[in-house]
């Protein structure tokens, strides 16, 4: 098969011909029809993810396609199924999985990180019966790949961890793919959304995707104070989807009393949290929670939003490109100035 491959962290990325994968006893092989490009893929290539331990390596973790082979122990998944899967695939048997929290599985499988990923014609996955998700018949593979880790992660962050309700004020700090996904989902469930970023282009897109207000943090003297003014008393829920000391502090300080902060963006290992928002945490009885991925059993709620017409994942897609573009696009991702998500299509146009 053809695959995108690199042999060292930060090294050259190229298309190569490698052996087709075979399924593990509990696994399956998926013929990839579409796969999304995510900043996590760039972090993996740069050596920021400890799960990548062996070379050569194939990146990619947001995909949709068709099951072409299954392991001997697989009972639910069938050859020919059109599927996607969470980027964190739970084993199904550890204590966390048994409690329904597959997204923090003790033995999680992550395509593109713990194993070769989906920037290839085929991808082998583990724990197939627990994690493969059948796609709605009217959902294209490109739309399903756009769900990826961004829309799925944002769905859990907004609805489960943030517990956003209709009429809530929700602030989203950082309007990359994850932040824009959070804007879309919060708006879809009836929240009043304030989007924050430092670039006008993603802020304009956030408004088109449902944000009621947008704030350019570079042009705002006090972002948290501006959110308090717009919402009258502060956000009910605020999400840091970027991951920096500044966005963390702004998110916490923008909350009303007894509000909820959801940390979704990853902070660097060198980041030190400022004391001001942590002191506010006590005085105002604020909640701070993390959010990581989405369990397989929670996907029907996400699909319901899409099928109802309240959420359209294709609105998040900025570019659709052939897989051959992936080496250049992955290496250039840190300088990408567009808005939205790039999806690589492996299906020839008809």
Located regions from the model:
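C-terminal hydrophobic helical "lid"/dimerization subdomain
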Residues: 249-253, 296-350
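Short, surface-exposed secondary-structure boundary micro-motifs
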Residues: 33-35, 72, 88, 102, ...
């Amino acid at each position: 098969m053809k695959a995108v491959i690199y042999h060292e962290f930060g090294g050259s990325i190229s298309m190569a011909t490698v052996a087709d994968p075979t399924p593990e006893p509990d696994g399956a092989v998926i013929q990839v029809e579409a796969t999304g490009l995510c900043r996590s893929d760039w972090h993996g290539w740069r050596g920021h993810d400890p799960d990548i331990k062996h070379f050569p390596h194939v990146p990619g973790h947001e995909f949709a396609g068709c099951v072409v082979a299954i392991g001997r122990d697989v009972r639910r998944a069938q050859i020919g199924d059109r599927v996607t899967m969470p980027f964190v695939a739970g084993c199904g048997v550890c204590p966390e999985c048994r409690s329904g929290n597959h997204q923090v599985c003790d033995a999680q499988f992550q395509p593109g990180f713990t194993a070769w990923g989906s920037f290839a014609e085929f991808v082998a996955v583990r724990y197939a019966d627990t994690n493969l998700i059948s796609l709605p018949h009217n959902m294209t593979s490109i739309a399903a790949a756009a769900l990826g880790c961004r829309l799925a992660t944002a769905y859990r962050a907004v609805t489960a961890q943030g517990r956003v309700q209709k009429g809530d004020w929700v602030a989203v700090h950082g309007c990359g793919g994850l932040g824009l996904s959070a804007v879309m989902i919060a708006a879809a469930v009836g929240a009043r959304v304030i989007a924050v970023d430092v670039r006008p282009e993603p802020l304009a897109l956030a408004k088109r995707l449902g944000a009621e207000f947008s704030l350019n943090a570079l042009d705002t003297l006090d972002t948290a104070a501006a959110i308090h003014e717009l919402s009258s008393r502060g956000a009910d829920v605020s999400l840091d989807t970027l991951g920096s000391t500044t966005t963390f502090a702004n998110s916490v300080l923008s909350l009303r009393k007894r509000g909820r902060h959801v940390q979704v963006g990853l902070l660097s290992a060198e980041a030190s949290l400022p004391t001001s928002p942590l002191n506010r945490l006590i005085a105002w009885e604020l909640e701070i929670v993390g959010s990581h991925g989405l369990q397989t059993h929670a996907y029907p709620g996400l699909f319901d939003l899409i099928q109802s017409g309240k959420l359209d994942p294709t609105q998040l897609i900025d570019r659709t490109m052939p897989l051959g573009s992936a080496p250049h696009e992955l290496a250039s991702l840190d300088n990408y100035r567009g808005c939205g998500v790039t999806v690589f299509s492996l299906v020839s146009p008809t």
